[in-house]
């Protein structure tokens, strides 16, 4: 996937952090939940534990002389996932608010803080 050119004004912000619990909204894995293993803000993608898993054939090498197959998670586009509300367990949008001088993420549906 080509990256935006150096001069583009692409928004490199994500609503997700490593460790967040998210749910997949669309596609083959719709409805599955998992923790964010890796956030890729430049590509607007996230890697979710146990979702979008592929089997990769690995050639034998010095570190792995046997070779074989390994399971690996691929990145999903950030628009296909949503944060899980800690109170209801359902997908929610996120709003940022300042609480006690700190900027925190708040679930829109329930008003609970996520951070």
UniProtKB/Swiss-Prot annotation:
GO cellular component labels: cytosolic large ribosomal subunit
PANTHER family cross-referenced by the UniProt entry: MITOCHONDRIAL RIBOSOMAL PROTEIN L24
NCBIfam families, per database record: rplX_bact
Record family assignment: Belongs to the universal ribosomal protein uL24 family.
Annotated function: One of two assembly initiator proteins, it binds directly to the 5'-end of the 23S rRNA, where it nucleates assembly of the 50S subunit.
One example of a Gene Ontology biological process annotation: translation
GO molecular function, one term: rRNA binding
Organism annotation: Deinococcus radiodurans (strain ATCC 13939 / DSM 20539 / JCM 16871 / CCUG 27074 / LMG 4051 / NBRC 15346 / NCIMB 9279 / VKM B-1422 / R1)
Official protein name in the record: Large ribosomal subunit protein uL24
HAMAP family named in the record: Ribosomal_uL24_B (MF_01326_B)
Keywords annotated in UniProt: Ribonucleoprotein, Ribosomal protein, RNA-binding, rRNA-binding
Subunit note: Part of the 50S ribosomal subunit. Contacts trigger factor when it is bound to the ribosome.
InterPro entries for the chain: KOW (IPR005824), Rib_uL2_dom2 (IPR014722), Ribosomal_uL24 (IPR003256), Ribosomal_uL24_CS (IPR005825), Ribosomal_uL24_KOW (IPR041988), Translation_prot_SH3-like_sf (IPR008991)
């Amino acid at each position: 996937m080509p990256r935006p050119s150096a001069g583009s004004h692409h928004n490199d912000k994500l609503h997700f952090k490593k460790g967040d619990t998210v749910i997949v909204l669309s596609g083959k894995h719709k409805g599955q939940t998992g923790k964010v293993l890796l956030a890729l803000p430049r590509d607007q993608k996230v890697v979710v534990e146990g979702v979008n898993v592929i089997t990769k054939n690995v050639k034998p090498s010095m570190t792995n002389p046997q070779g074989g197959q390994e399971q690996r998670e691929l990145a999903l586009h950030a628009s296909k996932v949503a944060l899980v509300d800690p109170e209801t367990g359902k997908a929610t949008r996120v709003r940022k608010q300042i609480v006690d001088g700190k900027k925190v993420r708040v679930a829109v549906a329930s008003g609970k803080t996520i951070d």
